[in-house]
A protein has these predicted regions:
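Charged, low-complexity N-terminal segments of organelle-associated membrane proteins
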Residues: 1, 5-23, 111, 115, ...
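Alpha-helical transmembrane segments in multi-pass membrane proteins
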Residues: 2-50, 61-68, 105
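Membrane-active amphipathic alpha-helices enriched in small hydrophobic residues
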Residues: 13, 37-42, 68, 72, ...
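Structural signal for membrane-spanning alpha-helices in multi-pass inner-membrane proteins
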Residues: 14-22, 39-47, 77-82, 151, ...
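Transmembrane helix-loop junctions in multipass membrane proteins, especially transporters and channels
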Residues: 23-26, 48-51, 82-94, 155-163, ...
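Juxtamembrane helix-loop-helix connectors linking adjacent transmembrane helices
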Residues: 50-115, 127, 131-132, 166-176
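Transmembrane helix-loop-helix hairpins at the membrane interface
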Residues: 104-239
């Protein structure tokens, strides 16, 4: 089967998986990892090597120290940004209303159901297939665009979940325009993140650093989301 056809099939599979995740009643925390495992198995069966996929032992061993440093720097940067007064609204996120939920998300849900499977889907399987016929630049652009669109269906609720996003979007749009603005902003932001993850994939020749940074970015944001409520709870119980 031609590489172009296989790439198109994987892009179609990603679109189908995304619809299932966002519109079905199936558990996304199980569905996304299962989908990633299935596509990875299919990629290996089609002839892609572990080196092409960025998953060989040698690649991972060489990338591990850098991945650890990158994760630490990312988490520190998010923590520093979250501590700024201007970011207070963005920390107020209803998805992490329960501090225990924020911790669970940071150390269980995000690594296992977000960072690892998404990096396998986009920077391993899709990346390896696209590089066979598009080259580095074309591959980077296509997978970044696909990564941005992956987040489109789930983006609409963000203006309701996050106080900072709601305020920012509300200052430029109202009604249906709020939803359109939120979705467009999320797609653009995640596409840019996809570009960054792709560059990391090229520079390190491994998927591991992308997984580490992806996890650190989302986990630190989740933990920061519980800060306002932890502080309010502390004040409420102080006599």
């Amino acid at each position: 089967m031609r590489s172009e056809v296989r790439s198109a099939l994987v892009l179609g599979a990603l679109a189908g998986l995304n619809v299932l995740v966002q519109r079905s009643r199936l558990n996304p925390d199980v569905l996304v990892p299962a989908g990633a495992a299935a596509l990875l198995a299919g990629a290996r069966a089609s002839g892609l090597s572990s080196v092409e996929l960025g998953l060989s032992r040698r690649q991972s061993a060489r990338a591990l120290p850098g991945a650890a440093v990158a994760a630490a720097v990312t988490a520190g940067a998010v923590a520093a940004a979250a501590s700024l007064p201007v970011a207070s609204g963005f920390r107020d996120d209803s998805r992490y209303a329960d501090p225990a939920a924020a911790v669970r998300s940071a150390f269980l849900t995000i690594p296992l159901s977000v960072a690892v499977p998404e990096e396998l889907l986009f920077r391993s399987v899709l990346d390896a297939l696209l590089r066979r016929h598009l080259g580095d630049v074309g591959t980077t652009v296509v997978q970044a665009a696909a990564f941005g669109l992956w987040h489109a269906l789930g983006a609409a609720s963000l203006s309701h979940d996050n106080a900072g996003v709601a305020k920012a979007v509300g200052s430029v749009a109202d009604g249906r325009g709020r939803t359109v603005t939120t979705v467009a902003g999320v797609v653009l932001a995640t596409a840019l993140a996809g570009l960054g993850f792709a560059v990391l994939r090229r520079r390190t020749d491994s998927v591991l650093p992308g997984i580490a940074v992806h996890w650190a970015l989302n986990a630190a944001a989740a933990l920061a989301g519980g800060i306002p409520r932890r502080r309010r709870a502390s004040r409420a119980t102080t006599w």
